[in-house]
């Protein structure tokens, strides 16, 4: 009897681990790193180089819960699309390992937890901004824009630009001009980033009937749009200097990083059908945003010392 119970327990451990991993993957953890970096960067700037460790911790926790909720809802709603795409058909919901009602309950619990954490330990404004981000991503982007227009990621990019607003509001309780510049940076960064990805997996989107720009307009038109958005993005990043929010260290870093990103977008413009170039720009855009916000943090240490 003892051996039977022990063997059952041993068999249940891998199943439990696999189930927990499925729920964890619903939150799309890999794409949350940049959200946390932008949130922390905004808090650091808003606090002029100083943020209470507890406030930083709870805001990042609340932001993680909000992003996890939005991503889980996205997986739930897009389960029909995911089933048709090679990249996503093995996800837990289309594969039947997590039932739709279970995913809905999980996503709702994460959203409620996010609001509770931010409202209790940061402030109500930050909590409401986080909830608005979930709502925008789920209702406006996932339910509406993604399946109806090539501009889905342009307008939907507003959802990904909300985390720095949450971070700023957590520190100050309001939103100044600089907070909206941070919003604008991510808003303008989003199309080049995601269109580069869409160029890499265009056939998957075509099979699923998702009207991403490369599917509808082709790679050449997409590469042109990427280049245009990149050219607009770089000057937006420099606005923080004349506002007095950032100093010369950031200005130099933003300028150098901007030229690096423009060079990558130009290479894609010259070879729009080369998947190596779209993959290169996709990766470059990730490091670009990460290093840009790191530069903000470093600059604020000296600027507000």
From Swiss-Prot:
Its EC number is 2.5.1.141. One of its GO terms (biological process) is heme biosynthetic process. Pathway: Porphyrin-containing compound metabolism; heme O biosynthesis; heme O from protoheme: step 1/1. Pfam families: UbiA. It comes from the Bacteria. GO terms for molecular function: protoheme IX farnesyltransferase activity. It is an enzyme of class 2 (transferase). It is a multi-pass membrane protein. One of its GO terms (cellular component) is plasma membrane. It is found in: Cell inner membrane. CDD domains: PT_UbiA_Cox10. Keywords: Cell inner membrane, Cell membrane, Heme biosynthesis, Membrane, Transferase, Transmembrane, Transmembrane helix. Its main location: membrane. InterPro entries: Protohaem_IX_farnesylTrfase, UbiA_prenyltransferase, UbiA_prenylTrfase_CS, UbiA_sf. The keyword Transmembrane applies. It catalyses: heme b + (2E,6E)-farnesyl diphosphate + H2O = Fe(II)-heme o + diphosphate. HAMAP family: CyoE_CtaB. Carbon 2 of the heme B porphyrin ring is defined according to the Fischer nomenclature. Belongs to the UbiA prenyltransferase family. Protoheme IX farnesyltransferase subfamily. This is Protoheme IX farnesyltransferase. The gene is ctaB.
